[in-house]
């Protein structure tokens, strides 16, 4: 077996997003292709994007993250050029890998902009990259991801700092306000085959301990499947209403811990809908920033890269779960969605 070439590049792996009104529907068609999502739901989400001029902030935030990473790579002696590829919009994975091949790159380390393990946040990206390599053909660079950093000290410190800063804006402290951690809901069929919930709860606990939050909960947002399909709950809006009904909420901090950047789902679901609900109920609400370009988060990514380059002797991790694996097991995060019954027949497994 031939020896693997050394790592010669870094790939930022992301979801992608529209950058204008004309991009919105083609982008959403990419996102929802092959999924059992009602068209009315797609049109509803399209209105969310149009509310913000058809521009998702995710692309600009990825550009800012790349710029911040480049500075830290230079400072830490990491001599890897940075590339960027998306699942659902420009720059697409195949286009990026094609450019990397043209640049003579053979083997890349990748950071997935998802801190928690599940099919859509990890395995699907790996499948996307395999498909892109097949499309590029002979000479396409190898791509290997760094480990999940959900319990890395850098991520926990960044999240705790953002919660504390948000609490200050409403004259509170994490110890004296309700804190809700939100993550993207996923189908129960997906959640049952991965460590998404376990990692989220551990990360939330670690952040709460780090910032002194006493009264906190994990809730979910942004579900997109049909009503008949069970997804992770409770929904953030339902949770706020139920908590306020049970015991009047004076103040609330919401941290989108499951999202790396303040992209469209964060802006609409939290800054629009959750904020409106809190105004109607007289709750002082502050939304903490996602990880973004927080210095501790950026330094964490550098550290994960240095681990794989053999420049660190340890793998920092807080809590009980320890450092996550570098290489995903073969059956990691498997998910085969079921199609709805057709003409009264039994559900058919998707290929």
UniProtKB/Swiss-Prot annotation:
One MF annotation (Gene Ontology) recorded for this entry: ferrochelatase activity
The protein's Enzyme Commission number: 4.98.1.1
Catalysed transformations (reactions): heme b + 2 H(+) = protoporphyrin IX + Fe(2+)
Record: residues binding Fe cation: 184, 265
Subcellular locations according to the entry: Cytoplasm
Keywords of this entry: Cytoplasm, Heme biosynthesis, Iron, Lyase, Metal-binding, Porphyrin biosynthesis
Entry-linked InterPro entries: Ferrochelatase (IPR001015), Ferrochelatase_C (IPR033644), Ferrochelatase_N (IPR033659)
UniProt-listed GO biological process terms: heme biosynthetic process
EC class of the enzyme, as a word: lyase
Cysteine disulfide links: none
GO cellular component assignments: cytoplasm
Pathway of action: Porphyrin-containing compound metabolism; protoheme biosynthesis; protoheme from protoporphyrin-IX: step 1/1
Domain of life assignment: Bacteria
SUPFAM superfamilies: Chelatase (SSF53800)
Family, per entry: Belongs to the ferrochelatase family.
Function, in words: Catalyzes the ferrous insertion into protoporphyrin IX.
Xref: HAMAP family: Ferrochelatase
Protein's name in the database: Ferrochelatase
Organism (species): Rhodopirellula baltica (strain DSM 10527 / NCIMB 13988 / SH1)
Native organism taxonomy: Bacteria, Pseudomonadati, Planctomycetota, Planctomycetia, Pirellulales
